[in-house]
Amino acid sequence: LELPPAVAEWGDVPGARRLDRVLFRCWLRLDPTLVGFLLSQIQQGELYTVHEIDRPGKAPRRIAEPDRVLKFVQRRILERVLEQMEIHPAAHGFVKGRSIFTNAEQHTQKAIVIALDARDFFPTITFKRVNGMFIKSGFAADTAGKLAGLCCFRGRLPQGAPTSPMISNLICRRLDGRLSGLLTKFGGTYTRYGDDMTFSGPEQILSLLPL
């Protein structure tokens, strides 16, 4: 099976909607019966183990870890769908070839460096937003709903699923573009590593931030 056009461009490819119908069986190589079963179990609140991790000075971080089969399916979606989609260059977290070090390198020798942490980052990304992201990327509505359903838990993006970091990068693409463009106008730089946003540049950038 040949690699289809980049998923982000499927909307401009003739017959893209027909390709969606065979996505699970031919491209992801997942049995539709298995997909239906997993979606049913997720809707019933199954297939995830939820626990909390204590953080000094912060609220505990809630982790929802998928079971072995669901995690396998999510990794397949990550590799064959999500990683074929384009994210913004300002995103450095969970991206091949980028790291916390490449993120920090963008802010060396700057007069002002400010780091902000987005509160409850993953839980604020809802099923509706994930579903919308897949639809805007060219998937038919029913396929987008199934993909979003396999990647969400209790209506939100779970921290602990292998698909969540890349989905968050794709969801934040517009935000990353707007903040990057704004900082550039003032001679500054913006990057994001997961839920950590960093702004740097001359003192003028202080007027842009709600500090």
Residue ranges and their predicted role:
Residues E46-Y48, R98-I100, L182-F186:
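Short amphipathic beta-strand starts and helix->beta connectors
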